[in-house]
Amino acid sequence: MEFRQLRYFVAAAEEGNVGAAARRLHISQPPVTRQIHALEQHLGVLLFERSARGVQLTPAGAAFLEDARRMLELGRTSVDRSRAASRGEIGQLDIGYLGTAIYQTVPALLHAFTQAVPGATLSLALMPKVRQIEALRAGTIHLGVGRFYPQEPGITVEHLHYERLYIAAGSSIARQLRQDPTLLRLKSESLVLFPKEGRPSFADEVIALMRRAGVEPRVTAIVEDVNAALGLVAAGAGVTLVPASVAAIRRPFVRTMEMADASAKVPVSLTYLTDSRVPVLRAFLDVARRGKGQK
């Protein structure tokens, strides 16, 4: 049974005449007659009572007409869905993320993508950078979002944008730093950095930034994550540096101020298999790059 047989049958049933069906289909009458006969032979039933005035559905034909319409609609829908999938307009995108990217970058990306591609679905999983790389290679995620990914063969790391750095300090220390929020000014401050795992990391970048500015950092602690660092800062154990997305969230007993140094910024990056041809990933990257161009 072929889709063209179904189309010819439905047209003849709706027109009540094979010649009229042929004109509607923009073909000659003999192919329509032949294909309807072939369909009847395949089904083993007569679909039409034929007369000089035209054709009339038999009970079997009337029952089959509704099924034929549904099959044709399903065929059209299947074609549309397969074409949409090939363009990345539908399908599931699996994303791994780590760290402070979840505060602003990930929500902004997901919002932009779902607005642009409403037929796609998204899943998020918190995972360390090493696990993200493993998951990319295993095909369990399509994309990683984070910072400071190591260079790996077959893996692309694409910087999406840079975030300014802010000093986070307790209220009394913040008053002293506010007049000169620079890397050089931090040389006498106790630094609480994060994260402890996943090197190279944000902590390594802060240390490198300070050394490039001619400052040897006084690191008193490297803790698990940003929340632990801010907890120590609130307790007066030192100061820390955080991206703008973290500074935007108010916390008790912690004050933030943007750093004056032009170099005080860190990237947010996307990572994915270099040779990936997953359409929904390509659609996501297109949306992300358009957003990058608008910043």
Curated annotation (Swiss-Prot):
Domain of life assignment: Bacteria
InterPro entries per UniProt: LysR_subst-bd, Tscrpt_reg_HTH_LysR, WH-like_DNA-bd_sf, WH_DNA-bd_sf
Q: Does the keyword Ligase apply?
A: no
List GO molecular-function terms, semicolon-separated.
Answer: DNA binding; DNA-binding transcription factor activity
Q: Which residues bind DNA?
A: 18-37
Question: What Gene Ontology cellular-component terms does the record carry?
Answer: cytoplasm; protein-DNA complex
Location of the HTH lysR-type domain: 1-58
Q: Which GO terms describe its biological process?
A: catabolic process
Q: Where in the cell is it found?
A: Cytoplasm
- Write the record's keywords in alphabetical order, separated by commas: Activator, Aromatic hydrocarbons catabolism, Cytoplasm, DNA-binding, Plasmid, Repressor, Transcription, Transcription regulation
The record's family statement is: Belongs to the LysR transcriptional regulatory family.
Q: What is its biological role?
A: Involved in the regulation of 3-chlorocatechol degradation. Transcriptional regulator of tfdB expression. Acts as a repressor in the absence of its effector (either 2-cis-chlorodiene lactone or chloromaleylacetate) but acts as an activator when its effector is present.
- Name of the featured protein: HTH-type transcriptional regulator TfdS
